[in-house]
Swiss-Prot record:
Its EC number is 3.6.4.-. Has a putative N-terminal zinc-finger, a middle region with homology to RecA with ATPase motifs including the RadA KNRFG motif, while the C-terminus is homologous to Lon protease. GO terms for biological process: recombinational repair. Residues 350-454 are annotated as: Lon-protease-like. Keywords: ATP-binding, DNA damage, DNA repair, DNA-binding, Hydrolase, Metal-binding, Nucleotide-binding, Stress response, Zinc, Zinc-finger. This is DNA repair protein RadA. It comes from Chlamydia trachomatis serovar D (strain ATCC VR-885 / DSM 19411 / UW-3/Cx). Belongs to the RecA family. RadA subfamily. It comes from the Bacteria. A zinc finger (C4-type) spans 11-28. SUPFAM superfamilies: P-loop containing nucleoside triphosphate hydrolases (SSF52540), Ribosomal protein S5 domain 2-like (SSF54211).
């Protein structure tokens, strides 16, 4: 009896299935994202399936620490939680041209220099193109094997032949399995090829890196299950026209998340930035209104970032509120609190807020700096010079506690700032050494903070 082929419609954004075409996906509510897929019913293997594993009491499980591969790139080791775990699968996403292939080729050279075999599957480029990039990056190694292939079965054959320690897939959207009838890059292909690569990585203990393209919204293209399958998800951030890039770990089964690695772009590749705060503050104008410096904590890194605001009279009945690098919904909430609790009128003004350097901030500790930048620009008055600002703002206008306060103060001292404005309630528990090295101003409410304007 021939196997009956079924047709279903799958969302390219979230992977939701539907028996018929819909204009709007019922899962993620996106429009025109459903594509047709043909699937054969799965075989019923329950009659002959077996398992060699049995349930084990938790107290009887023998602990085995993960084997990690270290490179000379200390920032990369820190990003992955202390080195790359053998047999792990990591997904690196980013916009086209931002430097994903360049980075992984450099990391491959680090692994190769340590004596590890690397199989680099360059499906999007020819061997000569990848070789030219390697020459530009001054990379030369007999331990890196280039393989321009997109067929998963051929890739598996070369894995058996070469037995690599490291596998790089560039990119997952172009790899296809001949057992599926759908086109490369489709939801089914991305899901199944990633699942197969995960199985190979775990079975053969091959550390695998796969490159994924991102959608217009900045998320990795393909079904959401792609991020659930892998062990680590890294996002390449930053402006493709700027001379630095940022890599953020948003998922890591073997280490902390939200680690941030900042790299500078040079003719011979990407290099780690030793002093990120100095990089973001090097172009700051000393005497200007509407500007504050905030300390933020990204993983184990503490950075000082400039927040810039511009407030101008609006010629329209509906004023404009725009942000860059700051959550627009959070910003609207802060402006409402500012008007209600501090009596700062903004309903006739256009308000713009930008995080200098292209960094994206999601932590609430940036609230105080953002609000004071707006008030400073509105009144065209200066804030205290050489101070940093940190604190979360509640709906009642209170300045709430933030985490890692000692790290924020320490970074402010290192960068030469003479004072910090912070929640009043956190001053009491600070070490005495901080009180001797930096001026600390505590504020209880947003109204207290506004009074700091000269």
């Amino acid at each position: 009896m021939t196997t009956k082929i079924k047709t279903q419609w799958t969302c390219t954004e979230c992977g939701t299935h539907s028996p018929k075409w819909l204009g709007q996906c019922s899962g993620c509510l996106q429009w025109n994202t459903l594509v047709e897929e043909r699937t054969a019913p799965k075989l019923n293997t329950s009659s002959y399936s077996s398992s060699s594993s049995i349930p084990i009491p938790l107290n009887n499980v023998e602990f085995q620490e993960e084997i990690r591969i270290h490179t000379q790139a200390q920032g990369w080791n820190r990003l992955l939680g202390g080195g790359t775990v053998r047999g792990s699968l990591a997904l690196l996403g980013g916009e086209p041209g931002i430097g994903k292939s360049t980075l992984l080729l450099q990391i491959s050279s680090q692994f190769a220099a340590a004596g590890h075999k690397v199989l680099y599957v360059c499906g999007e480029e020819s061997v000569s193109q990848t070789s030219l990039r390697a020459q530009r990056l001054q990379i030369s190694s007999n331990n890196i094997f280039l393989f321009p292939e997109t067929n998963l079965e051929d890739i598996k054959q070369q894995i058996d032949n070469i037995a690599p320690d490291i596998l790089v897939i560039d990119s997952i959207q172009i790899i296809f399995s001949p057992s599926l009838s759908s086109a490369p890059g489709s939801v089914a292909q991305v899901r199944e090829t990633t699942a197969e690569l995960m199985h190979i990585a775990k079975q053969k203990q091959i550390t695998t890196f796969i490159i994924g393209h991102v959608t217009k919204s900045g998320e990795i293209a393909g079904p959401r299950i792609l991020e659930h399958l892998v062990d680590t998800v890294l996002y390449f951030e930053g402006n493709a026209h700027a001379n630095y890039r940022m890599i953020r770990s948003v998922k890591n089964r073997f280490g902390p998340t939200n680690e941030l690695l900042i790299l500078s772009m040079h003719t011979d590749g990407l290099r780690e930035v030793e002093n990120p705060s100095g990089l973001f503050l090097q172009e700051k104008i000393v005497e200007t209104t509407g500007s504050t410096i905030i300390p933020i904590v990204e993983g184990s890194e503490t950075l000082l970032i400039e927040v810039q605001a511009l407030v101008s009279s609006s010629p329209f009945s509906n004023p404009v509120r725009k942000t860059s690098g700051f959550d627009p919904n959070r910003f609207s909430l802060l402006l409402a609190v500012l008007e209600k609790r501090a009596n700062v009128k903004l309903y006739t003004s256009d308000v713009f807020l930008s995080i200098a350097g292209g960094l994206k901030i999601t932590q609430p500790s940036a609230d105080l700096g953002a609000v004071l930048s707006v008030v400073s620009s509105l009144y065209n008055r200066y804030l205290p010079k050489n101070y940093t600002y940190t604190g979360e703002i509640g709906l009642g206008g209170e300045i709430r506690h933030v985490s890692h306060m000692e790290h924020r103060i320490k970074e402010s001292i290192i960068m030469g700032f003479k004072g910090i404005v912070m929640p009043f309630g956190q001053i009491k528990g600070l070490p005495k050494e901080f009180l001797d090295q930096i001026d600390i101003i505590g504020v209880k409410t947003i109204k207290d903070a506004v009074r700091l304007l000269q």
